[in-house]
Amino acid sequence: MGVRKDLKRAKRRTDLASRTRVEVVRDEDGVVREARTPALAPRPTTGSTADLPFTNAAEAPEAVVLRRRHDNGTWQPVTAAAFAREVTAVAKGLIAAGLEPGGRVAVMSRTRYEWTVLDFAIWAAGGQTVPIYATSSAEQVEWIVRDSDARFVVTETAENAATVTTGTARHERQPRIWQLDEAAMSDLTILGGHLPDEEVTKRRAALTPGTTATICYTSGTTGKPKGCVLTHANLHAEAANTVELLHPIFKEVTRQVASTLLFLPLAHILGRTLQIACLMARIEIGHCPSIKPDELRPALKEFRPTFLVGVPYLFEKIHDTGRATAEKIGRGASFDRADRIGVRFGEAYLNKFLETGKGPSPALYAAWALYDLLVYRRVRKELGGRMRYAISGGSPLDRNLNLFFYAAGIIVYEGYGLTETSAAATIVPPLRPRPGTVGVPVPGTAVRIAADGEVLIKGGVVFGAYWNNPAATDAVLQDEWFATGDLGALDEDGYLTITGRKKDILVTSGGKNVSPAVLEDRLRSRPPIGQCVVVGDNRPFVAALITLDPESVAHWLTVRKLPADTPLSEVVRDPRMRADVQKAVDYANEAVSRAESVRAFTLVEGEFTEDNGLLTPSLKVKRHAVTAAYAEEIEALYGG
């Protein structure tokens, strides 16, 4: 497989191994309490991320840095020179519209090419970008626009524009609104057509690394979103160090033109820093407006990326779809064997690569080769056929699922971070993968475990303040250490494992502390589970609310030759479905003690979605909203 050849070539390069040197600090008992990785990219003393398009245009004007999709499914290449010209034209339009240095422009759109142009144009004009999720309500928009004092808003659709208009109707000064679907980019280009390019050059020259680049509002599960202030230095620390660490694997060693399809919402900081890193490395970027697998899969087959950055949900759906397809053609048992073989093969090969054990036996190699023909190559085909690498973040990825993808020729590196850390604070180093962990500190970053188990982060990626909220800032920043609210542990080599959220820890009536995330992550990795919430605080045992994945339900009905329109109310009561869900529960319980295991569950009708207020835009469950919405079902679990 190409990916394993890549790793062998990379391993022979001694300069790459030195890039992942991790220093650890132990407490008096010998337990690792802190890990830090030296920076690979120097901190900038001048300039800003606004300079990137222009640096690329000067150094490699004909290099293809983006591809823009047309309605017929073709992808038009965009050169560095062309991208810089478009950024300049839109920046001049914003200046002509009245954007002052330090002024804020909100962008409310799904992920599309124009979003990237706007981000760099706002910076080039000396402004600050305020991203808004395209699914935000009028109330959320009202708060973000008012709190940030954004004078301009660029929306994608008429519906988005109407939401902004409604949300800001009572503002003393309504923002000026443009709409991408109604030629916003052309309008801005025409508006600034009379200005000389030098005006943009002058605005860019006034920016420094410490200038605010963006105010990102957290999609918190409770309370009003907080505006996280990130500077150009923050974004540079994240992108430049990540490129230095991963660039040799993603571009140089693979010996193929590197490209990625960006589908994460650009209102999320991970997507934003990804596009900066790609422009730094001149990796081709494409855009897809949806994270939904059914809409994403066709784009993957068209664009054929060499790597992706996604969330566990995507990898779970790809795996589950493969299994459902296999069952439809009578090869469900074969897929299950491929699953088991994949885990064993991935484990054995990694042991050999890391020199911690023997590699796959001849028999295991032969079994892998068979299932590569039957199963694994189909997985690669689903992802476009060229993909070798992926980065997963947002929540833990099931270890066995990670090993399955490894057997399929795709290495998934996990990372961990928050908006406040400019995206990734840790990542699994390419030459020292360790499935089941979220890696070591990103170069230039330190991770510390507090006495109560909370993960603390320090370094160039850490934000400086919440906008207009010094009390909230003081609550999480102490001596430049950011208190994440997550619980975790460092191993002997400085690899971090996240064990849950500090505020989500359940304490049963028997006094047992339970981290619901461990159970929930494993549950979600198994069909037919859609979403779930583990409960049990002040209760005699742990239980779970579980939704069914619609695709899994449709497949389940087909396999059992039941009517496709069978009501969900009947499906959730079917003993056969409950037996299948119990298998997923048993798998989740393998990771915990008996006292922490799920003893009972209820299958609820419907789904947890953004629309019903039970998911955030980044697909995280709003735990308190779910428990409130299903209070009766929870009481019934405990005999109430």
What label would you give each PLM region?
Residues G2-R19, A96-A97, A124-L191, D580:
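Structural core segment of the AMP-binding/adenylate-forming
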Residues K8, H70-N72, E159-P209, G322-Y376:
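ANL superfamily adenylate-forming
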Residues E62-F120, S137-E142, A233:
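Conserved AMP-binding/adenylate-forming core of the ANL superfamily
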Residues E62-V64, L195-Y217, K224, F250-S259:
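Conserved pre-ATP/AMP-binding loop-to-beta segment of ANL
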Residues P77-A81, A213-A240:
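Conserved AMP-binding A3 loop
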Residues A134-T166, E238-L261, K292-F307, E382, ...:
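Conserved ATP-dependent adenylate/AMP-binding module captured primarily in the ANL superfamily
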Residues H236-S259, L266-Y376, R386:
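Conserved AMP-binding/adenylation subdomain of ANL enzymes
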Residues P441-T508, S525:
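Conserved ATP-binding/catalytic segment of the ANL
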